[in-house]
Curated annotation (Swiss-Prot):
GO MF terms held by the record: GTP binding; GTPase activity; guanosine tetraphosphate binding; translation elongation factor activity
Disulfide bridges in this chain: none
UniProt KW Nucleotidyltransferase keyword: no
Protein name: Elongation factor Tu
Residues reported to bind Mg(2+): T26
UniProt domain tr-type G: residue ranges: 10-217
Oligomeric form and interacting partners: Monomer.
Residue ranges, annotated region (G4): 136-139
Gene Ontology cellular component terms for the protein in this record: cytosol
Annotated gene: tuf1
Protein's organism: Saccharophagus degradans (strain 2-40 / ATCC 43961 / DSM 17024)
Length: 407
């Protein structure tokens, strides 16, 4: 069968399900594909097709993730669901599947549980910008309380909702403005809709995704940034730096900054080449060579970035969320302690840094995730949300994300 052509007529938004084990993330994922395919076209994916998530390797870390897609009237959604808690931790920290927004699934019969809290914290740390809540298993709660019209049901729902809004506030998400939809993913998956808890609730959830999660800014519309991979000097022409444009556009004649490792310097782009052809501009996703005026071969090095002036700044100290590879993943066999000084691999280069563990944490075991403050020996062009690998002698032992810049 011929591959279907991917239609680019709708904006593309990346989402995913998060929440405590057995609260119904995978059931809701399957229900979303079923309801959307029936109402707005596309293909439904069965629960088993999502639950048997294939393992992927991202930066040497094994992560089990399921990817499904569905359409709303105005958008195309790519949705990621993970089978186990550890997979969520790894996925969110490595940015293997970056989310423009998350669907927090919480069982209304249980209310918020430890992983509910942990996934909200992780979303904050790794920069998931928006959360929409689905209060699942509303049919079971209604059964326990004597029906959806009973006072007890209304009180219980209100209580769980209040707890969730407070929890979101704790981690600096706007609890009061967050859309919360109650329903039953299982009913929706089975095509039932008693008391509008099934299909209708899932439709309401999709409407909330459409209205509450803004369309993400495309990489090409963001300020120009290109990590420097290599530097050449071409006699009579000057210095050329090569790399893959991470975001934005660089045009011939534009002023640029060289940021990181040393003091920030200014330069001008006098040419862009790709495959030995001269271009007027280089765009996000392209591998290009940028010719720089007045910049000497020794003024630039791998690990720096070329960027739009003022758009990114160099820093050395930051708070991060880290996942430490387990022994089975080829990581360390032993824990590390405070004073640990590995290399931090940002974009194209390693920089040594010292780790400060949170209060009360004596050591970090392989397979753990932990918040820590890192101080690098050289500044790196950095923003919150930037991903990095932790290495020892060229071997990856962890992955992390910049949660907050300190200095």
């Amino acid at each position: 069968m011929a591959k279907e052509k991917f239609e680019r007529n709708k904006p593309h938004v990346n989402v995913g399900t998060i929440g405590h084990v057995d609260h119904g993330k995978t059931t809701l994922t399957a229900a979303l594909t079923r309801v959307c395919s029936e109402v707005w076209g596309g293909a439904a994916v069965a629960f088993d097709g999502i639950d048997n998530a294939p393992e992927e390797r991202e930066r040497g870390i094994t992560i089990a993730t399921s990817h499904v897609e569905y359409d709303s009237p105005i958008r195309h959604y790519a949705h990621v669901d993970c089978p186990g808690h550890a997979d969520y931790v790894k996925n969110m920290i490595t940015g293997a599947a970056q989310m423009d927004g998350a669907i927090l699934v919480c069982g209304s019969t249980d209310g918020p549980m430890p992983q509910t809290r942990e996934h909200i914290l992780l979303s904050r740390q790794v920069g998931v910008p928006y959360i929409v809540v689905f209060l699942n298993k509303a049919d079971l709660l209604a059964e326990d309380c004597g029906g959806v019209d009973s006072e007890e049901y209304a009180e219980m729902m209100e209580l769980v909702e209040m707890e969730l809004r407070e929890l979101l506030d704790t981690y600096e998400f706007p609890g009061d403005d967050t859309p919360i939809i109650a329903g039953s993913a299982l009913m929706a998956l089975n095509g039932e809709d008693e008391n509008e808890l099934g299909t209708t609730a899932v439709k309401k959830l999709v409407e909330a995704l459409d209205s509450y999660i803004p369309e993400p800014e495309r990489a090409i519309d963001q300020p120009f940034l290109m990590p420097v991979e290599d530097v050449f000097s071409i006699s009579g022409r000057g210095t050329v730096v090569t790399g893959r444009v991470e975001r934005g556009i660089v045009k011939v004649g534009e002023e640029l900054e060289i940021v990181g490792i040393r003091d920030t310097t200014k330069t001008t782009c006098t040419g862009v080449e790709m495959f030995r052809k001269l271009l007027d501009e280089g765009r996000a996703g392209e591998n290009v060579g940028v010719l720089l005026r007045g910049t000497k071969r020794d003024d630039v090095e791998r690990g720096q970035v070329l960027s739009k002036p003022g758009s990114v700044t160099p820093h050395t100290t930051f708070q991060s969320e880290i996942y430490v590879l387990s022994k089975d993943e080829g990581g360390r066999h032993t824990p590390f302690f405070k004073g640990y000084r590995p290399q931090f691999y940002f974009r194209t280069t390693d920089v040594t840094g010292a780790c400060e563990l949170p209060e009360g944490v004596e050591m970090v075991m392989p397979g753990d995730n932990v918040q820590m403050t890192v101080t690098l020996i050289a500044p790196i062009a950095m923003e919150e949300g930037l991903r990095f690998a932790i290495r020892e002698g060229g071997r990856t032992v962890g992955a992390g994300v910049v949660a907050k810049i300190i200095a």
